[in-house]
């Protein structure tokens, strides 16, 4: 007897954008989440947090490797609990990512560093781990490097509209700014100022973002306004 089976599973594919809710934990402690109710349970300051699902463009390194692999095997509406080893999260801690700088280099710029502080140096975020004898040691490893992580995730929906896909790319890659749409053209408006100094986007960054928008939407032109 021949049986006819029908499967309605629709797993994710690279190049698709999805909205995802998640709770990330390390050793049982929450380090990031998008679910307000859980944040309130943990006693976190919900006033300063954003509780919207994040946009993830699959195949473009929007999230860590282990999380993306799990999402690829899920479908819209599905929830899952995932354990991710350090190798597929933020990698192992690397001693080569620790550097020592002369303390006077910071003093000359009017910066007083203290252990535990985070600084941006040469476009990299680092944490001051020690200070003494005229030297400052900075750790450029990701704070979660070397850590096994646990995630609860839910794929909320698939993002289909071109404008929303472009907005998702902007949010992930830049974190601020806005988009203006005019027919087949997208303009990325970037006016980010910090302490009176304008921070321009590098040509490499612009080209990468331009390629992602053109590849994953039907827009034909991407411009930048700074």
Per-region residue spans from a language model:
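FKBP-type peptidyl-prolyl cis-trans isomerases
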Residues: 5-226
């Amino acid at each position: 007897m021949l049986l006819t089976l029908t499967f309605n599973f629709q797993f994710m594919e690279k190049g698709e954008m999805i909205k995802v809710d998640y709770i990330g934990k390390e050793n049982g402690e929450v380090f990031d989440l998008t679910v307000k109710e859980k944040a309130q349970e943990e006693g976190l300051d919900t006033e300063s947090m954003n509780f919207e699902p994040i946009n993830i463009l699959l195949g473009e390194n929007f999230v860590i490797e282990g999380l993306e692999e799990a999402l690829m095997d899920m479908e819209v509406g599905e929830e899952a609990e995932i354990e991710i080893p350090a190798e597929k999260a933020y990698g192992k801690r690397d001693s080569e990512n620790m550097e020592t700088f002369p303390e006077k280099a910071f003093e000359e710029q009017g910066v007083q560093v203290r252990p535990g502080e985070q600084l941006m140096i040469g476009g990299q975020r680092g944490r001051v781990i020690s200070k003494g004898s005229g030297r400052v040691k900075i750790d450029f490893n990701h704070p979660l490097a070397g850590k096994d992580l646990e995630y609860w995730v839910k794929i909320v929906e698939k993002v289909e509209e071109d404008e929303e896909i472009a907005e998702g790319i902007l949010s992930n890659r830049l974190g601020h700014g806005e988009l203006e749409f005019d027919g087949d053209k997208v303009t990325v408006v970037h006016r980010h100022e910090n302490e009176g100094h304008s921070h321009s986007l590098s040509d490499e960054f612009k080209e990468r973002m331009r390629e992602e928008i053109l590849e994953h939407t039907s827009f034909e032109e991407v411009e930048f306004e700074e």
